[in-house]
A protein has these predicted regions:
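A short, histidine- and acid-enriched strand-loop-helix "catalytic/donor-clamping" loop
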Residues: 100, 114-133, 146-149
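Carbohydrate-associated surface elements
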Residues: 156, 177
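Conserved donor-binding/catalytic core segment of Leloir-type glycosyltransferases
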Residues: 189-220, 229
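Nucleotide-activated donor-binding/catalytic signature segment of Leloir-type glycosyltransferases, i.e.
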Residues: 241-259
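Short alpha-helical donor nucleotide-sugar binding micro-motif in glycosyltransferases
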Residues: 267-272, 291
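Aromatic "clamp/platform" in nucleotide-sugar-dependent glycosyltransferases that forms part
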Residues: 280-281
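Short hydrophobic beta-strand element within catalytic cores of glycosyltransferases
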Residues: 297-301
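Conserved acidic donor-binding segment of nucleotide-sugar-dependent glycosyltransferases
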Residues: 313-325, 333-338
């Protein structure tokens, strides 16, 4: 007789954090994670995102990806029902509400007496504005009217799904797992003649890489020999290269093109001193958690959502509007008072530890077992 429930998670794109999280969950569940898309097909990721899927994760094939129209960026997995019947999970967890194959998997689960979870971030439009309970969400609520649990990724998302979308007491809070064990071993930063800055996020409009370059140009003008390391992926790559030439930063900016594997990524953070993230919008971000674990100084936009519980302005980081002068002012607080690196790092490593694979798996299991009455 099995002691562990069989858990299936259906997710969009395979990422190393989720693959490692699936491994961590084996202590509590017979877990498998199935993905609609591989990073090699997803052009927004670097090649180093490709990793060993191990024994518990796989890419579903064949999958139809809708590139435009009403179902833009949605997936249909042709073999899904067959695969579900073979694995026969006790719990079906879905990464999001609106993917067509997720809806099919959900109805299969309900028809066959399975427990159901939807794991979700906040729902927003393309401008980062939170959605209300309009026609689409009324329809989705009808589809998922009998869901057992809606697991959101941050405290500030609860109200939207509990009240606006009317899922009520089904809503609980958990979090994304972060692959931070190697980062926690990095040495503390201290006083240097010049510092290395990191823009770790993709070069996409909402993350404002052009703004990061303008901020760094001001830093470099005041502190020669400063360096900026930049994520090499994203649709704004050419515009960023043009901006680098315009600002004459060619000798001071390094694109991160030589990361050979996921397990090498932490070395980029070890080389860096201060994370700069002047985003116009973000739902919360792994890069901030990684920088916290690494012991870096952190200067981020006040438009980053979902992280108020762990990053607090002037306590363990600095937050400001995504404007050049404001970012420069906050960066200089680290430069002029290097003791802040140690103070913030010591606080951040305590705050970020619960996001590790092991701790997140433990928390997820406790919430799920209690909410779904798996011990009864």
């Amino acid at each position: 007789m099995r002691n562990r429930s069989k858990l299936l998670f259906l997710s969009s794109c395979a990422v190393p954090q989720q693959i490692k999280f699936c491994n961590a969950l084996q202590k509590y569940f017979e877990a498998e994670f199935w993905f609609y898309e591989s990073p090699e097909n997803n052009k927004i990721r670097g090649k180093f995102w490709l990793t060993d899927f191990g024994n518990y994760c796989k890419i579903l094939k064949p999958v139809l990806f809708f590139k435009s129209g009403f179902l833009s960026h949605k997936y249909w997995a042709f073999s899904l029902i067959k695969e579900l019947k073979i694995f026969n999970p006790d719990i079906v967890m879905l990464g999001g509400f609106s993917i067509p194959s997720n809806i099919i998997a959900y109805r299969w689960a309900k028809k066959n007496g399975k427990k159901t979870i939807v794991f979700t971030e906040r729902s927003r439009n393309q401008h980062g504005v939170l959605r209300g309970g309009g026609a689409i969400w009324r329809l989705l609520h009808w589809f998922y009217r009998d869901v057992d649990m809606v697991m959101v990724t941050a405290e500030d998302v609860v109200k939207q799904f509990r009240d606006e979308f009317r899922f009520g007491e089904a809503v609980v809070v958990s979090r994304h797992a972060a692959d931070i064990d190697a980062y926690l071993k990095h040495p503390l930063r201290g006083k240097k003649p010049a510092y290395t800055y990191l823009f770790a996020n993709r070069m996409t409009e909402t993350y404002n890489p052009i703004g990061a370059l303008e901020i760094f140009a001001q830093v470099l003008s005041r502190y020669p020999n400063s360096r900026l390391l930049m994520n090499a992926a994203g649709e704004l790559a050419e515009r960023c290269k043009e901006k680098i030439k315009e600002l004459k930063l060619e000798d001071s900016v390094e694109f991160l093109t030589n990361i050979n594997s996921w397990d090498e990524l932490h070395k980029v953070y070890a080389r860096s001193d201060i994370l700069i993230f002047p985003a116009y919008f973000s739902n919360g971000n792994w890069t901030i958690l990684e920088a916290m674990a690494s012991g870096m100084g952190i200067v981020v936009s006040d438009r980053v959502l979902g992280m108020d519980q762990i990053i607090e302005d002037e306590t363990n980081c600095f937050k400001c509007e995504p404007k050049t002068e404001e970012f420069l002012s906050q960066i200089e607080r680290y430069v002029k008072n290097p003791q802040l690196f140690k103070i913030h790092a010591n606080l951040n490593r305590i705050k970020v530890k619960p996001f590790s694979m092991e701790e997140t798996a433990k928390d997820f299991a406790a919430i799920t077992i209690k909410k779904l009455n798996l011990n009864s």
